[in-house]
């Protein structure tokens, strides 16, 4: 059980919440802050004060005063009118993450909702009722209005949910779980939909998958080094300490650990003086991608615990301030950076694939074919990898450099952060398939070199991989092999810890 406080949620906790479906509870002290802030909102309504989002319309309608008797209708209208998402739904993990993050931001006690609203969000999480939320339609400021409106519909007993493996109307799930839909009161509709939880939840999922892939890429690259009789001297710690980047030093250390008892890697001058960059510069390139991952994680953990609502309520209602914390620019930049960092792992992997299959670049059978000429072997696998990395270059174009004014130019600059986050996840799926292709080719090369000569770590990895796909003894439909390895890398992440390889120094 993870206790939400509004200020201490971590990516590691989100891993458990999203993938192990661990439950959540609210910190009592934080809930007390929620209750106190709610009292301030009710006093504002009772006194008839003009406060944006509480007693006024929204966006360009901020100068329209709402009568006390119309406040509840205002909130309901807001949710229904803003539920304009389109396209395929987000994965359930993202939907679940949005519920958790929205509850966590409310627990900061500056949004003005009743504790009832927070409790309803937590009930949905704990009962695995996940809103069906279309992926497209958010500008990333005022936050993720459309996606979060689809989330909010479920609290009202409207919209659809994923429940017990099916896509059903929200009321079916609520009724089966004995939950009553709620009626939103002043400020609560706006507090539910004004924020960056869609881009952040998708960003968390993307980061978690990217981190696992980054480790797996080092194992796969190590196996390629063996298949190509790579020079281990390039990974000497003196080389990497001379440059000074922590992440580069750590990648070199991990690869030395992985290959420490390999009989296939060579010494400088043994077969050749130096390797091509895609082998020699693995620590420099993969290390730079780790720098990106560290940056992204830092920004995500700030945003996970941020108040991204508007307006925010301070000092018992004495200060109700309209700000712009809903603007997704920090996450938009982080997601665009993640796109570039992960695309580069695929770029260098594709070049290693080329070195594994090109007979002009190695002494292996052409295209790793068992019968060159009669059988094409891995020839078209490299085509597939080239296509995937080329697609990544298009997806890696920064979404955050774009902005389109909305709400009659009241919201005249937006982040496009959710587009960046979605594209980051698409890139990561492509990267995984490129790495799957490299792994298939590296395993085949290792067989030609001699499996018994591999390091202890790569030998284990090889045998695990061979449980997913057989050796290439004849041409076959290799698409199936690629998807099988990619699925295995995603669902059964083979970690460095399982190979007794230190993840960090």
Swiss-Prot record:
- An example of a Pfam family matching this protein is Lyase_aromatic
Cross-linked residues for 5-imidazolinone (Ala-Gly) are 141-143
Which of the residues bear the PTM 2,3-didehydroalanine (Ser)? 142
Per the UniProt entry, what are the Gene Ontology biological process annotations, in alphabetical order? Answer: L-histidine catabolic process to glutamate and formamide; L-histidine catabolic process to glutamate and formate
Where is this protein primarily located?
cytoplasm
Keyword Amino-acid biosynthesis, does the record have it? no
Question: Which Gene3D superfamilies does this entry report, sorted A to Z?
Answer: Fumarase/aspartase (Central domain), Fumarase/aspartase (N-terminal domain)
Q: What does the UniProt record tell us about how this protein is modified after translation?
A: Contains an active site 4-methylidene-imidazol-5-one (MIO), which is formed autocatalytically by cyclization and dehydration of residues Ala-Ser-Gly.
UniProt GO MF annotations: histidine ammonia-lyase activity
Enumerate the UniProt keywords alphabetically: Cytoplasm, Histidine metabolism, Lyase
Q: Does the keyword Lyase apply?
A: yes
UniProt-annotated location(s)? Cytoplasm
Which InterPro entries does the UniProt entry name for this protein? Aromatic_Lyase (IPR001106), Fumarase/histidase_N (IPR024083), HutH (IPR005921), L-Aspartase-like (IPR008948), Phe/His_NH3-lyase_AS (IPR022313)
Q: In which pathway does it act?
A: Amino-acid degradation; L-histidine degradation into L-glutamate; N-formimidoyl-L-glutamate from L-histidine: step 1/3
Catalyzed reaction equations: L-histidine = trans-urocanate + NH4(+)
Q: What EC number(s) is this enzyme filed under?
A: 4.3.1.3
One GO CC annotation, please? cytoplasm
Q: Which family does it belong to?
A: Belongs to the PAL/histidase family.
Q: Which PANTHER family match?
A: HISTIDINE AMMONIA-LYASE (PTHR10362)
HAMAP family, per database record: His_ammonia_lyase
Name used for this protein in its record: Histidine ammonia-lyase
State the organism's lineage: Bacteria, Bacillati, Bacillota, Bacilli, Bacillales
């Amino acid at each position: 059980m993870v206790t939400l406080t509004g200020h201490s949620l971590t990516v590691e906790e989100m891993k458990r919440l999203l993938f192990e479906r661990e439950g959540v509870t609210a910190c009592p002290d934080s809930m007390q802050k929620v209750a106190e802030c709610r009292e301030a909102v009710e006093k504002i309504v009772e006194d008839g004060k003009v406060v944006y989002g509480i007693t006024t319309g929204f966006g360009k309608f901020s100068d329209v005063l709402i009568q006390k008797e119309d406040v509840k209708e205002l909130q309901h209208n807001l949710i229904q009118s803003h539920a304009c998402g389109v396209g395929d739904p987000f994965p359930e993990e993202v939907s679940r993450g949005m519920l958790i993050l929205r509850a966590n931001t409310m627990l900061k006690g500056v949004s003005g909702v009743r504790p009832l609203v927070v409790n309803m969000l937590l009930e949905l999480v704990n009962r695995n009722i996940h809103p069906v939320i279309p992926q497209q339609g958010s500008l990333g400021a005022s936050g993720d209005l459309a996606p979060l409106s689809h989330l909010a519909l479920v609290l009202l007993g409207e919209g659809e949910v994923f429940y017990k493996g099916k896509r059903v109307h929200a009321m079916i799930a609520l009724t089966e779980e004995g939950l009553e839909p709620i009626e939103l009161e002043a400020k609560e509709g706006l507090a539910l939909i004004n924020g960056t939880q869609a881009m952040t939840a998708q960003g968390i999922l993307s980061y978690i998958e990217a981190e696992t892939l980054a480790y797996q890429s080092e194992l796969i690259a190590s196996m390629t080094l063996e298949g190509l009789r790579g020079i281990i001297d390039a990974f000497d710690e003196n080389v990497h300490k001379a440059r000074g980047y922590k992440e580069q030093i750590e990648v070199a250390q991990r690869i030395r650990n992985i290959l420490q008892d390999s009989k296939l890697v060579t010494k400088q001058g043994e077969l050749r003086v130096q390797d091509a960059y895609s082998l020699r510069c693995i620590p420099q390139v993969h290390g730079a991608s780790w720098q990106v991952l560290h940056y992204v994680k830092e920004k995500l953990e700030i945003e996970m615990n941020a108040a991204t609502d508007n307006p925010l309520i301070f000092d018992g209602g004495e200060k109700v301030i309209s700000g712009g914390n809903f603007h997704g620019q920090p996450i938009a930049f982080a997601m665009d950076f993640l796109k570039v960092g992960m695309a580069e792992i695929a770029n260098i992997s594709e070049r290693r694939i080329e070195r594994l299959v090109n007979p002009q670049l190695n002494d292996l059978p052409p295209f790793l074919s068992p019968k060159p000429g009669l059988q094409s072997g891995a020839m078209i696998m490299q085509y597939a990898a080239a296509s995937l990395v080329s697609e990544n270059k298009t997806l890696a174009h920064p979404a955050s450099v774009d902005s389109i004014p909305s709400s009659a130019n009241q919201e005249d600059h937006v982040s496009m952060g959710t587009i960046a986050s979605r594209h980051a996840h698409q890139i990561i799926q492509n990267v995984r398939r490129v790495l799957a292709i490299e792994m298939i080719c590296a395993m085949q090369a290792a067989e030609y070199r001699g499996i018994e000569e591999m390091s202890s770590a790569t030998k284990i990895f090889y045998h695990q991989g061979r449980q997913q796909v057989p050796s290439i003894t004849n041409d076959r439909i290799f698409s199936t092999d690629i998807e099988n390895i990619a699925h295995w890398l995603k669902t059964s992440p083979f970690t460095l810890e399982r190979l007794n390889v230190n993840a960090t120094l």
